[in-house]
């Protein structure tokens, strides 16, 4: 975007200068970030820009590098205060601003560069802009004397956002303004990618640019007009209350064709003929039509009808947008509004926005690693020019002294090596190092570090090499770290802090005698306590330890293994067998039967709290010790997407687990359609998938120690009365063997069809085994096919899906019960994700965190389609994609 330099100041005065507006404007900037780049330290910050009412702050707190410049005096008379200064970056390849934002919130990011011949060289600086690790755009700052503005809508993946300037040739990058504006998350939605502003017009013969405070989102609306048009307007304020909040004075004017019987035509040239566009058309009737008058027209894109018989509402906004990105043949976009036979008035339009799609595929470094390395940077006050932006990516900008790895495009990069040798470090070894959980090599040698060698180094299991030599460390090396060294860790330290057994001299005084005496006394006390405990236990035979074991439980598995009664949590959730019989009304209502036993419906004390009681079958082969361990484990697992354990029964030969009751049964039940229920809609299926993925993500990274489900399948995804999905049987599958499948290895557990082939082959269990099984479930959700069907040519669901994908026909892959009611982009995205999860190689599968992110993007894409009600007076949707069947990607 570009604005004419000679009229910039006058335009903004005409469009925005009103005292009442400025007072209101100062109150309406919540969430705004407005940085005046290069504002001198001796000037007031923040300050109010007198002509716009925007509150600007110095950028000095948001970047560690750069120098201050000022535009040539010839520009001062017609330049706003915020454009007078700039920050330029003669040093380093990449220089980055770091901003605090809200993860998942949509922001409009705007970068403005007014060269103003600040360096007296009269050149055209050209450089790249990056958001985080991803290329955003190339900014040619000398192309327009008036300055260049670049905007993009972006959703941060963390609470920290980097905007980077990257040198691409001999010219020096610089920036005049950097601004962030929060947007509503339900506006400007895409199936994938972000929206880069290409043009934003309001159709008027005015010369005024409309911006803040008229536009509360601080979008910049340029006027445009053509000799083939005629302007009409109203003095009344229209209703602009849809998600886009187009300024009211934008909607007070409209353009119609100069010839009433002719179509209205609008053309736009793209920068590249391959660009994909999202188009937003804003309409509001500005004339009060009589009962016998009408304004009705068709909307055509590139000669094809995209919307028929549209009628704008009087003084009420309607936004029509593309559901999917569109292209322009030869790079020339043609919009045509053609009146219908029923219309007495020509078509009109008030405003139009064009956005090109820009993709940000590179994942940023794991947030835990980023926080840790920034903590280390702050601890040692490191000011390396390369230590800006993302630590690991892009690879060409990796921070000096770091090595990182990333398995594939769906795996977050991790820091694996930190080399701060000979960098003048002082103080203690930084505690933040322990948070680099994938660190393999650590080199802090040849510095001035003091203090002791920290214990946490021994607990960093990924470390294979540590060099702490040539420092001023004192004390001794922790014994745990010495043990790690014996086990293969390469440890380099100065000799004065090494203390091998037998090498440390101890003064021979009376201390050894005292130590022997103390140890002897302690031994006597311990023996006495043990005897008393033994006697006490003999007098209390009613304890759980001394009850008869269940018929199939070896005695050695019971001794001293009862669930700890010292935990209040455990006591509160323990039920007697008589209470179990009471809550189930003597096992009156069975809900189902699995490999572990029968599940019964129940309620606690006749209350409204319904429960599902799983009684351990006498034929089950698990041991009491495993049952105890699972109960202790399940009692500490709490997540909204995991079926919660209400309590348990542990009495003689009666073992039971009591779960919350899930009234809508399981996912498989609803997909099968055999029980007369309604068909699950596509967006409901996606939400169920997200819920289940969140539950698994919690097991993998939210639990300590982490857990692997081992039996992810559609029957283990239960649904409550609100159709919130919760994973079930996420603990017992580790400890129990299936009674009906005793031939399955005691090492490998799971359900045929869902079982990770790599886990089955190697016996090595990891979180990626759950990811594979989840991929199979996702394919079930998409296709409603049986996981294994011998009647099919391709019996396994992954083989069948791959076969159908090669034929490129998505309608034959999708569940026919959906009857085509879905957004094809969200389907393709979900399908690709499912196939990645079900990849035979675990290294090529995404993590559950990545699965959650991708599924949420699918939901955003689908909701964007479903949320645009065709009967709404505020917003209607339009699809320029006229193909009924998408081609294979």
UniProtKB/Swiss-Prot annotation:
GO terms for molecular function: ATP binding; protein serine kinase activity; protein serine/threonine kinase activity. GO terms for cellular component: plasma membrane. Gene3D superfamilies: Phosphorylase Kinase, domain 1, Ribonuclease Inhibitor, Transferase(Phosphotransferase) domain 1. LRR repeats lie at residues 414-437, 438-460, 462-483. It comes from the Eukaryota. It is a single-pass type I membrane protein. CDD domains: STKc_IRAK. The modification Phosphotyrosine is found at residues 659, 759. This is Putative receptor-like protein kinase At3g46340. It comes from Arabidopsis thaliana (Mouse-ear cress).
